[in-house]
Structures are given as C-alpha cells and as structure tokens.
C-alpha cells in the first residue's frame, strides 16, 4: 500500500472512530452537537491520527486499541481549529473549503462545541476499551494529552502567537511559538501511539520525540510557505491570512528559498532519528513517508 492509500485508509478509520465516540453523546440533533460533528468530521488530513496509528502499529498494537488515542488527539485538534477561527482569535471564515463553525452555527455554538470536543478527548482516553493498554499507560496517555493541549503546549503557543501579532519576532522566538502551538500536539500523537505499546514503546520515546519535534516544526514551516505560494481554493482556507494578521513567518524571516531549505533539513533530521529504530528491526516506513509528505503537500 503506497502512502496516499495509507493516508486514505487512516482518514476512513479515524472518521469511523470519531463517529463512534460522538454518536452516544446526549443532545443529538441539537446545534451544539451538529457543530461538533461538522468541526470534527468534515474534511481534514488526519495527520495526527495517522501518527498514532503508524507509531502503534510499528510496535504491533492493534487498530482497535489505537482508535481511542487517534480519536482523542483529533478531538483536541478539531477543538483548537474551531476556537482558532473565532473572531477573537484569527477571525477566519473558511476552513477546509467550507464556512468555519462560528460562521455556520454562530459563535456561541462554536465555543461550546470546541469545549465539548476538548472534554470528549479525555472521556475517550479514560473510558474507551483499550485491551492492550495497562492502567499505568492509560493514565500516562491522559497526562500526555493534557500537557500537550494546555498552557504548557498548544494553548501556550497560541497565546504567544496572538501576542506576537504585528511585532517583529526573531527566529528563536518564532520556533518557541510553533514548538508549542503546532509541535506539542504532533509530539503527543506520536507519544500516544508509543504509550499504547507499553514498555517497548516507552523505551523508544527519546528517539520518537526527536522525530516528532522535527516534523512538527517542518509542518509549520511548510504551512507558512503555503500561505505565501498557495491559493485559497487549494488550501481550503484564506491564502495570505498570516500576512494580513501581521504574523512573523519563516518565509518573512528567512526568505522563501531558505524557508524551504529549513523544512527539508528538518525532515532530514526526522529521518535520521528513525534510523535508530530501523536498526532495532522496527518498520519505520510509514513514519518516513509521513515526514516526506509534510513538505510535499500543497494544502
């Protein structure tokens, strides 16, 4: 199976898992649950669930067990996008080629849906059937996702990003923003897959962290590049939005060609990290393919 087929299979699997966890919720057919479904299920590359599945499968964990952490990390990602798009944040009206949640359902429902998706993520990790995961590892997974999505991770990065609007931000400060805002949840996805495998996954965490940190930063560099060279129809969101908000970006600081080189160098670093796992007879091909895709994608 080539990478596009793997990614397509992941999208299908992750969406089935998300639907299964959303379906039993109360208040079905109300605007807030419809907003949750719209924000979580319509479109998206599902890269974070892919990282959960790919890492877990590398250690022999079943898809059935990995559905829960894959759905949980995507719930956090979906909530973050819903809230990022709000007028008080990035004020975007287009996401994945469709009206953003607050445009379609109103700000109140968008806020509540984001809140509900965030808490659903932790309900999934605490309650879902994960037969191969010990209680110790389940608690570690909950703690990992909480840290990555809170003030020590994604929320802290978003706060730094908002504070930096309209200001000149040096490269080290820009990397600090994105290691938190984007990179923390990507690292969490990899770690959740590893923690699903117990001790053998835990032993690989230092290597996997290096891989995840490299692809997380590369993902943001490529996003910044696409904000310059992409188009709204392909991106599914407003092209040039970062420039309009006065945000510092890698192309603005480094120039377009040097930004591209930085992204390539980061992916080379990620691939180098995986060699240590390949030497242990682990199949890293899916993680390698995902790393390459990050800088080859056009949206």
From Swiss-Prot:
Its cofactor is Mg(2+). Keywords: Cytoplasm, Isoprene biosynthesis, Magnesium, Metal-binding, Transferase. It is an enzyme of class 2 (transferase). Its EC number is 2.5.1.10. Mg(2+) 1 binds at residues 84, 90. It catalyses: isopentenyl diphosphate + (2E)-geranyl diphosphate = (2E,6E)-farnesyl diphosphate + diphosphate. It comes from the Bacteria. Mg(2+) 2 binds at residues 84, 90. Isopentenyl diphosphate binds at residues 45, 48, 77, 96. GO terms for biological process: farnesyl diphosphate biosynthetic process; geranyl diphosphate biosynthetic process. One of its GO terms (molecular function) is metal ion binding. (2E)-geranyl diphosphate binds at residues 95, 181-182, 220, 237. It is found in: Cytoplasm. Belongs to the FPP/GGPP synthase family. This is Farnesyl diphosphate synthase. It comes from Escherichia coli (strain K12). The lineage of its organism: Bacteria, Pseudomonadati, Pseudomonadota, Gammaproteobacteria, Enterobacterales.
């Amino acid at each position: 199976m080539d990478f596009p087929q793997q990614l397509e299979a992941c999208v299908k699997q992750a969406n089935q898992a998300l639907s299964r966890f959303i379906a039993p919720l109360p208040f079905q057919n109300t605007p807030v649950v419809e907003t949750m479904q719209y924000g979580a299920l319509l479109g998206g590359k599902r890269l974070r669930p892919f990282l959960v599945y790919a890492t877990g499968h590398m250690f022999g964990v079943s898809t059935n067990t990995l559905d829960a952490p894959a759905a949980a990390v995507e719930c956090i990602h979906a909530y973050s996008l819903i809230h990022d798009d709000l007028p008080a944040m990035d004020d975007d009206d287009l996401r994945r080629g469709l009206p953003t949640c607050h445009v379609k359902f109103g700000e109140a429902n968008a806020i509540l849906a984001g809140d509900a998706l965030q808490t659903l993520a932790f309900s999934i990790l605490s309650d879902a059937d994960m037969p191969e995961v010990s209680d110790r590892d389940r608690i570690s997974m909950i703690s990992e996702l909480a840290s990555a999505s809170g003030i020590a991770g994604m929320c802290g990065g978003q706060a730094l990003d908002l504070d930096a609007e309209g200001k000149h931000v040096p490269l080290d400060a820009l990397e600090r923003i994105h290691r938190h805002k984007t990179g923390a949840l990507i690292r969490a996805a990899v770690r959740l897959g590893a923690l699903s495998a117990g001790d053998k996954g835990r032993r690989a965490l230092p290597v996997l962290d290096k891989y995840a940190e490299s692809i997380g930063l590369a993902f943001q560099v490529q996003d910044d590049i696409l904000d310059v060279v992409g188009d709204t129809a392909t991106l599914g969101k407003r092209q040039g939005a970062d420039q309009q908000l006065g945000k510092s970006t890698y192309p603005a600081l480094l120039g377009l060609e040097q930004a591209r080189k930085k992204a390539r160098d980061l992916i080379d670093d990620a691939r180098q990290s995986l060699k240590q796992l390949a030497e242990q007879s682990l199949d890293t091909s899916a993680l390698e393919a995902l790393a390459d895709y990050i800088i080859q994608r056009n949206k």
